[in-house]
């Protein structure tokens, strides 16, 4: 590989590394604080952990030349159900006027109940979107956009847009405790990465996922069920969304509302694209997805510490996404 090919393949990452080096130099001058500290690194990994679940789910759909615009609303749905079930005492809001109180159930059982409910709900909605793609050949941009609107409208109407009370603080201490200064929520993300990597690379389903994404017609001729693979990808995505939403609620220990998670769909898609998962289908690695999530989480965290306006942060993210997609398109055109 010559230097021009190396820059063509890794140019974006080199630029991002240079940006982070510049931020590490500028931050102590402007804010009189170091950016590259163990505390900040752990905070970035902690914030990224739930988002890794979401990005892993979306990545499987992008492998099939699809996407998912409902991820953010799935998070909002998960946060609302989590704060309903895991709240300590009578909640501040109701669902269709009914007030819930689950404190009669032990805290560990409440947390596990919420995880099951959350996974069922997110998997159910994801499966519906998958069915429209697999059976009716509807582009997932449309089916997941419909999902996004339905979920947000349903949750907002059912709860009247009220924010629910914070979860029982004892629950995060049970499931994502700190060991010294180390947040164990990171271990949940590590396990998810290992499991999804195994599914993608060591199972028949994973091999079929790449085959269908690369050429669905050829995959069908070779005996692969395109319907089953498509549904499997959406079901896996739904499960990951459920776990990610549950972890985010435990991480925040805060109130939940239908509006929570707004924009997270774009973050997940952007992380996949920057990580090298191609919209042309059949191309992508788990390591790239994780790298993409860490890049965007670290960038947002660093710019926030530096005091950069949130709106300007969107501009930075947009430029990176545009550059990543442009490089991906150029690679596709060159291959053709």
Language model: regions and residue ranges:
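Short loop segments and helix-boundary regions at transmembrane helix junctions
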Residues: 2-7, 62-67, 86, 106, ...
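Cytosolic-side transmembrane-helix boundaries in multi-pass membrane proteins
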Residues: 1-26, 221-228, 251, 301-336
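Membrane-embedded helix boundary and interhelical linker motif in transport proteins
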Residues: 63-128
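Helix-loop-helix "hairpin" substructures at the membrane interface of multi-pass membrane proteins
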Residues: 110-117, 125-128, 181-256
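Transmembrane helix-bundle core of multi-pass membrane transporters
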Residues: 4, 99-105, 112, 136, ...
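Membrane-interfacial amphipathic/re-entrant helices at transmembrane-helix boundaries
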Residues: 1-55, 90-113
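Transmembrane alpha-helical segments in multi-pass inner-membrane proteins
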Residues: 241, 252, 256-317
């Amino acid at each position: 590989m010559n230097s021009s090919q190396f820059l063509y393949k890794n140019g974006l990452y080199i630029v991002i590394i240079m940006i982070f080096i510049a931020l590490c130099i500028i931050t102590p001058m402007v804010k009189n604080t170091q950016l590259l500290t163990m505390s900040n690194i752990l905070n970035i990994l902690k914030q990224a952990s739930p988002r890794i679940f979401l990005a892993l789910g979306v990545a499987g759909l992008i492998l099939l030349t699809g996407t998912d615009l409902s991820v953010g609303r799935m998070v909002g749905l998960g946060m609302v159900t989590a704060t309903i079930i895991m709240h300590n005492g009578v909640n501040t809001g109701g669902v269709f006027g009914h007030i819930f109180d689950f404190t009669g159930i032990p805290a560990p059982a409440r947390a596990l109940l919420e995880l099951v409910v959350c996974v069922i709900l997110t998997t159910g909605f994801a499966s519906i979107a998958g069915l429209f793609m697999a059976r009716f050949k509807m582009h997932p941009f449309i089916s997941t956009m419909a999902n996004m609107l339905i979920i947000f409208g349903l949750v907002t109407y059912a709860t009247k847009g009220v924010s629910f009370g914070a979860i029982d603080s004892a629950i995060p201490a049970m499931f994502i405790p700190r060991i010294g200064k180390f947040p164990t929520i990171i271990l949940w993300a590590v396990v998810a990465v290992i499991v999804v990597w195994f599914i993608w690379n060591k199972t028949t389903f994973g091999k079929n996922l790449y085959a269908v994404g690369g050429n669905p017609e050829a995959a069908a001729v070779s005996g692969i069920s395109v319907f089953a693979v498509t549904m499997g990808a959406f079901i896996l995505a739904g499960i990951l969304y459920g776990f990610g939403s549950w972890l985010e609620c435990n991480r925040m220990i805060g109130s939940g509302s239908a509006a929570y998670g707004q924009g997270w769909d774009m973050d997940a898609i952007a992380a996949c694209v920057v990580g090298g998962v191609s919209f042309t289908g059949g191309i992508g690695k788990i390591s790239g997805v994780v790298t993409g999530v860490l890049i965007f989480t670290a960038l947002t965290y660093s710019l926030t510490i530096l005091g950069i306006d949130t709106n300007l942060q969107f501009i930075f993210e947009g430029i990176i996404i545009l550059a990543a997609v442009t490089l991906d398109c150029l690679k596709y055109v060159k291959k053709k």
